[in-house]
Amino acid sequence: MSKTGTKITFYEDKNFQGRRYDCDCDCADFHTYLSRCNSIKVEGGTWAVYERPNFAGYMYILPQGEYPEYQRWMGLNDRLSSCRAVHLPSGGQYKIQIFEKGDFSGQMYETTEDCPSIMEQFHMREIHSCKVLEGVWIFYELPNYRGRQYLLDKKEYRKPIDWGAASPAVQSFRRIVE
């Protein structure tokens, strides 16, 4: 376990079998150590794991726990190549502003709570820009926290590409809490 209390272990096979790779800090490319990843143990902290090297491709947010097969973290396949610890601010405060248009224009909604459906809660089809005022959040491509994920730290995002998306297709979001 690192000084910050973060640790993640990747296993080649399901149910924590086969070769393993232990990590306690950000790693831009571990696929040379493991040809595939079918299970993970997060023993400390919350982690963002990525399909490709250099924190690229599909991303999955994994809080502390055990994931005996890749379907448990909503993985599309057994390929993972990089990871980074998610650093949560102290104080436990959360606040986000979402906008129906880019550059913080159009209707704005502010919340401090998770949202399983932006259509039901805010009557919006998409999010085109946002300001993360407090905390760390995850945007999801589909309602009920499903689909592609995007990690948002405290800053302003003028357009979807700023949070790593090709389109404004965000249908749900939630806070990362420990």
Curated annotation (Swiss-Prot):
Q: Where is this region: Connecting peptide?
A: 88-93
Q: Which domain of life is it from?
A: Eukaryota
Q: Note the InterPro entries from the entry.
A: Beta/Gamma-Crystallin (IPR050252), Beta/gamma_crystallin (IPR001064), G_crystallin-like (IPR011024)
Statement: the UniProt record of this protein carries the keyword Acetylation: yes
Q: Where is this region: N-terminal arm?
A: 2-5
Q: Which GO terms describe its biological process?
A: lens development in camera-type eye; morphogenesis of an epithelium; visual perception
Q: Name one GO molecular function term.
A: structural constituent of eye lens
N-acetylserine carried by residues:
S2
Q: What is the effect of changing S39C?
A: In CTRCT20; uncertain significance
Beta/gamma crystallin 'Greek key' domain boundaries: 6-44, 45-87, 94-134, 135-177
User: Pfam families attached here?
Assistant: Crystall (PF00030)
**Any idea which UniProt keywords this protein has?**
Acetylation, Cataract, Disease variant, Eye lens protein, Repeat
Which PROSITE patterns has this protein been placed in?
Answer: CRYSTALLIN_BETA_GAMMA (PS50915)
Biological function: Crystallins are the dominant structural components of the vertebrate eye lens.
Note the subunit structure.
Answer: Monomer.
Tell me which PANTHER family the record gives. BETA/GAMMA CRYSTALLIN, GAMMA-CRYSTALLIN S
Q: How are the domains described in the entry?
A: Has a two-domain beta-structure, folded into four very similar Greek key motifs.
Q: Disease linkage in the record?
A: Cataract 20, multiple types: An opacification of the crystalline lens of the eye that frequently results in visual impairment or blindness. Opacities vary in morphology, are often confined to a portion of the lens, and may be static or progressive. In general, the more posteriorly located and dense an opacity, the greater the impact on visual function. CTRCT20 includes progressive polymorphic anterior, posterior, or peripheral cortical.
Which family does this protein fall into?
Answer: Belongs to the beta/gamma-crystallin family.
Q: What is this protein called?
A: Gamma-crystallin S
- The organism encoding this protein is Homo sapiens
